Amino acid sequence: GGASLAAKSAGADVTHVDAIRQVIDWTRENMELSGLTGIRWVVEDALKFLRREVKRGNKYSGVVLDPPTWGLGPKNEKWKLEQSLIEIVELVSKVVEPGGFVVMNTYSGLPPSTLETLWRRVLPDASTECGELCLQASDGHLLSTGSLIRVEL
């Protein structure tokens, strides 16, 4: 929820989507503690939300994605990022307006080059920048925790 709060504090109109109500409640509480208002909260699977937004023709100037590596749906449906990543990229590419941006981080072991390949396949003319997310160990070594990509349309 930190990205949603940062975007709102910078003046953006924000829609925060998460399938887990507790995450929405926690982020809403942080919004209130920060003195912010006006975030649109949607408790729903992000893929279902994106499919509907594409059908409605809704567009966004930016999309920030922080998908889980895996999860269980309300009926114990198993979800793995690797199985849905292509659809996520395709749907997001349809809801971001020209001149918009996408920021996506993953923690599934996908290297940055794989993220870049997927986004470039769907948006070949977009500008991309990708890298590794790391934590610095006490001995100074960097420990990889995930990947990040920024896409500008």
What spans do the regions from the language model cover?
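Active-site-proximal loop/short-helix segments
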Residues: G1-S4, V23, L65, T69-G71
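Conserved SAM-binding loop of SAM-dependent methyltransferases across substrates and taxa
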Residues: G2-V14
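Hydrophobic/aromatic anchor residues within beta-strands of the central parallel beta-sheet
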Residues: V14, G38-W41, C130
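S-adenosylmethionine
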Residues: A46-L123
